[in-house]
Amino acid sequence: MSSFRFTQVNVFSADPLGGNPLAVVHAADALSETQMAAFARWTNLSETTFLLSPSDPGADYAVRIFTPGGELPFAGHPTLGSCHAWLAAGGQPRQPGRIVQQCGVGLVSVRSDGPHLAFMAPPLLRTGGLEPEVLSRITQTLGVQPSAIVHHEWVDNGPGWCAVMLSSASQVLSLKPDWSALGPLKLGVIGPHDPGHDAAFEVRAFISGGYEDPVTGSLNAGLAQWLIGRGLAPRSYVASQGTALQRVGRVHLCQADGQVWVGGEVVEVIRGEVTL
């Protein structure tokens, strides 16, 4: 057995008990995929990441991202949390203020912007309106009439997200999903807040197995690409997520030079070693 540096960080909130936690194992090149998957099941967090030496010369570090159910090619809050952990451990990017992460979807750029880290949203792998059978499953899951869905789209950037927009944030917050109807879908739901709220939209993320993700970077990335691209959201806005779970997070979205950036605060909560 070997010991590895370990940190647990909180992403998308300055509150250590808000946002979405992430477990990070550093310098994990010696671990097998089986060991990584087993440790991710043990932590039972939405994601656990393993920092590795990059194989791509353009990357500062590599990361593998695991949920308790398996590996993901990309996820948003693990990208920001892993980057924060790498920097806090003394990582030095090749280019000041810009960090390049290697993961399952290739290279992802991360920038340091004051108290925030922000990643460049990866290209969408699937777009377009949702199929009738998918919409039928969603309305059954959410317990709403088809007319309650004002817009819908595939926003898949790796995890497989589909998304619907409701007419208000209050509708989003009132949802009590029928988990048995969701099936294999990974569903994002978004609705606008009233003027004067510190966030423009409320977001919720529903995943099969009865799980609601507290704050989801990949989903918010896909939502921003869709909504900004269609003129349904301003080029810069803040999304709130986790409210229904009392884990309020804030995700900062902006479009610059044709690219969508997804940012938020990250704080370290636990530091130590793990023996595996």
Stretches with model-predicted labels:
Residues 1-74, 80-276:
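Active-site proximal loop and beta-alpha junction motif in alpha/beta enzyme cores
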